[in-house]
């Protein structure tokens, strides 16, 4: 049987049962109706529980604007400073660094950061962060914290349109998401490799099915029913291409054999919100290994794959329920990717 459309191979549950779930962030308030800070740590690749570790840190919290008579949309009454009012929720990715302290010290240092926020626009809408009051616990991330940071607004803010342009805005950290990295590295497939198209190849893509602890339909993320009749979500990632000698036919059995030899293990992390980590513990073909820069661990941040889905579920519980390998013929080389809605060189449209 040759592959002309798509074929599916379902991985055994043992490939994701150990590290395929994320606990939710608890949103609790104290007697003063202030949100109680919390740190959540996920371990990828068997890192040490204490002592020197490599941590990827992702801050979550609320945007707060200066109060005035005018009213803007707000998401909560969880006010910290009476002169400021919550106007949205969002995040601040800090990245990976080596950390030697304990979790609670890191949480305390993060909640004491003085973060000013500005909304602007370049090629896309951006959020600008300026950070002061950096405690020693956060010095490993100081190279980013001491400089202004810009991020795509649709990746770090749930509702960027609610951030006013004529008032001061602060970002108040409530939650700290950490991914502790052991022997696993944070390798991300380069965009040039992800867009690679070669003749006589089969594209191996992964479809990851997840369930979450919140209702997402009202937030524009429609859940579907799985084979058990339960609501679930899914997203896709690209693993790479496999190639046969010219004239040899691809079969479903051949592709399944290739993927089974790789012995893939799947984990969920908190890089950029929610992230998928794939670890190849078996043998990899030379063609595919070269596309992966001969790395065996790949990180797929949902922030880059599906920003809106990431924004909706990044604080909730997430659990992998199924992973499928999708075998699809590689797109012909003459197909072109159009990232811009306006096509260049067509009619009266000028480049």
UniProtKB/Swiss-Prot annotation:
One GO BP annotation of this record: virion assembly
Gene3D superfamilies: Viral matrix protein, C-terminal domain, Viral matrix protein, N-terminal domain
UniProt keyword terms in alphabetical order: Viral envelope protein, Viral matrix protein, Virion
GO MF entries: structural constituent of virion
Recorded GO CC terms: viral envelope
Annotated compartments: Virion
InterPro entries (alphabetical): Matrix_C (IPR042539), Matrix_N (IPR042540), Matrix_Paramyxo_C (IPR055413), Matrix_Paramyxo_N (IPR000982)
Cysteine pairs bridged by disulfides in the record: none
Matching Pfam families: Matrix_Paramyxo_C, Matrix_Paramyxo_N
Function per UniProt: Plays a crucial role in virus assembly and interacts with the RNP complex as well as with the viral membrane.
Family: Belongs to the morbillivirus/respirovirus/rubulavirus M protein family.
Identification of the protein by name: Matrix protein
Lineage: Viruses, Riboviria, Orthornavirae, Negarnaviricota, Haploviricotina
């Amino acid at each position: 049987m040759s592959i002309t459309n798509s074929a599916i191979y379902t991985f055994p549950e043992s490939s994701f049962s150990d590290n395929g779930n994320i606990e939710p962030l608890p949103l609790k308030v104290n007697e003063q109706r202030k949100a109680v800070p919390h740190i959540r740590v996920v371990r990828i690749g068997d890192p040490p529980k204490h002592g020197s570790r490599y941590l990827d840190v992702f801050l979550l919290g609320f945007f707060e604007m200066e109060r005035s008579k005018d009213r803007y949309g707000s998401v909560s009454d969880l006010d910290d400073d009476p002169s400021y009012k919550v106007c949205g929720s969002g995040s601040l990715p800090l990245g990976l660094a080596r950390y030697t302290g304990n979790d609670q010290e890191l949480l305390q240092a993060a909640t004491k950061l003085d973060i000013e926020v500005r909304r602007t626009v370049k090629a896309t809408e951006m959020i600008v962060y300026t950070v002061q009051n950096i405690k020693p616990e956060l010095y490993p991330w100081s190279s980013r914290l001491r400089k202004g940071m810009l991020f795509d607004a649709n990746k770090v803010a749930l509702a960027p349109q609610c951030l006013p342009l004529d008032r001061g805005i602060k970002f108040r950290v409530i939650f700290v998401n950490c991914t502790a990295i052991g022997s696993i590295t944070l390798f991300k497939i380069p965009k040039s490799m992800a867009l690679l198209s070669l003749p006589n190849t089969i594209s191996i893509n992964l479809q990851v099915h997840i369930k979450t602890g919140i209702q997402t339909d009202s937030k524009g993320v429609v859940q579907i029913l799985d084979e058990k009749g339960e609501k679930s979500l899914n997203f896709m990632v690209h693993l790479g291409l496999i190639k046969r000698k010219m004239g040899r036919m691809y079969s479903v059995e051949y592709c399944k054999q290739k993927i089974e030899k790789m012995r893939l293990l799947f984990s969920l992390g908190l890089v950029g919100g929610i992230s998928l980590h794939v670890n190849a513990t078996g043998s990899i073909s030379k063609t595919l290994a070269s596309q992966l820069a001969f790395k065996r661990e790949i990180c797929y941040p949902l922030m880059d794959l599906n920003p809106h889905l990431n924004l909706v579920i990044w604080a909730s519980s997430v659990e992998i329920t199924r992973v499928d390998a999708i075998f699809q013929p590689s797109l012909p080389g003459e197909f072109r990717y159009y990232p811009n809605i306006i096509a260049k060189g067509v009619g009266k449209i000028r480049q």
